[in-house]
Regions:
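N-terminal cap/lid segment of alpha/beta-hydrolase-fold proteins
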Residues: 30-68
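Short substrate-entry loop that stabilizes the transition state in hydrolases
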Residues: 70-72, 78-114, 183, 257
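Alpha/beta-hydrolase active-site loop
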Residues: 119-139
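Alpha/beta-hydrolase fold nucleophile elbow
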Residues: 140-152
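Glycine-rich nucleophile elbow surrounding the catalytic serine of serine-hydrolase chemistry
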Residues: 150-160
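Hydrolase active-site cap/lid region
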Residues: 160-223
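C-terminal catalytic histidine-bearing segment of alpha/beta-hydrolase fold enzymes
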Residues: 276-340
């Protein structure tokens, strides 16, 4: 009986891990046509509306605004995996108390939004561009103080939009434990015989260790694990070279998806540091440094409290909320990147 419960727990964990993961070529020819509209806020400062994306499909957005006319700083959330909305905890309420507007959205093919699910490819990246265009035109918004917070796989969407649309008026990107590219990360994990990667592909293969032929046929987020063209459209470690704003990585010692591995973190932040020309930092480590696998013990990583476990539910944890709140306040109000 104990063995059955243990196996059930392991496969539930694998299913949650799959949700996290499921958590550059030339720009498509698109013409932004976002129109401003009168926004009706509830007594609690919340508004629900839809705006056209760059391809004309409507995308649903949620806005929470402090009382008053502003202007206020704005934080746009980008969900990971197949999530519909990024903010799934008390963080927006805590940000509201600090005088910060939050904007949340469902990408095309998700929730109330029109279109087909693009799994954080160019179409979803265009959704974020449309939202930034819309938000930056609102009267209660500080035009030079719009930030992005991405969760997990949302880093792929956020970095893609920032790289492909460098003129977006974004003050900073905060990335909580995003993968460099799910396909590439899994390939690397398999090559290094990392437990999380082996368990994930077995789960995707109905609980069995896949043969070479089966492995080549496994799909994740609509694409083969080995489809280079597919993952090139969803590769934060490539997009990071061209991001057009300061970049802050938030990383716990135990990653919510990739265990103790930090290869994905290193791939993104080192690329941004060496190629983008932007201010970069991971946690409270010194800014603009190059990270090494051999020196991981020398860097500062966050830790969960004793009653918290790394995983999909980490997005709801008080530890993550509190740490993200502190970094959001720092980036909006202290603006450490301006002292570079």
């Amino acid at each position: 009986m104990v063995k059955v419960i243990h196996n059930l727990s392991r496969y539930v964990s694998l299913f949650l891990l799959l949700l996290i993961f499921t958590a550059c070529t030339s720009n498509p020819k698109v013409t932004p046509t976002v129109e401003q509209q009168e926004i009706q806020f509830s007594s609690g400062g919340t508004a629900f509306l839809s705006i056209p994306s760059l391809n004309g499909n409507k995308i649903a957005i949620h806005i929470k605004k402090p009382a008053g006319d502003g202007p206020f700083p704005v934080l746009i959330g980008v969900a990971g995996g197949d999530g519909m909305y990024a903010f799934q905890s008390a963080l927006p309420i805590r940000l509201l108390e600090k005088g910060i507007v939050t904007v949340d959205f469902a990408s095309q093919g998700r929730g109330e939004s029109e279109g087909d699910d693009n799994h954080h490819g160019f179409v979803h990246q265009d959704d974020l561009k449309a939202i930034v265009d819309f938000v930056s035109g609102l009267s209660f918004v500080q035009k030079d103080n719009i930030g992005i917070l991405s969760y997990s796989y949302g880093a792929v969407l956020a970095t893609g939009a920032l790289a492909r649309y460098p003129d977006m008026p974004i003050a900073f990107l905060i990335d909580w434990e995003g993968p460099s590219s799910p396909g590439k990360d899994i390939q690397r994990g398999l090559e290094n015989d990392e437990a999380w990667a082996n368990e994930l592909v077995q789960f995707l293969n109905n609980g069995r260790e896949p043969t070479s032929e089966e492995l080549s046929q496994i799909l994740l987020h609509g694409g083969s694990l080995f489809d280079e063209a597919y993952w090139a459209e969803r590769d934060a470690s490539r997009f990071a070279a061209d991001i057009s704003c300061p970049y802050l990585r938030v990383q716990f010692d135990q990653d919510h998806a990739q265990g103790l591995s930090k290869s994905h973190m290193i791939a993104i932040i080192n690329t941004a540091t060496m190629s983008s020309g932007q201010w970069t930092r991971c946690n409270d480590n010194p800014p603009n440094i190059i990270y090494s696998e051999e020196e991981l013990s020398h860097y500062h990583f966050h830790h969960y409290s004793d009653n918290e476990i790394a995983g999909l539910s980490s997005i709801y944890s008080q530890s993550v909320d509190t740490i993200l709140l502190g970094y959001v306040e720092e980036m909006f109000f202290s603006r450490p990147y301006e002292s570079q």
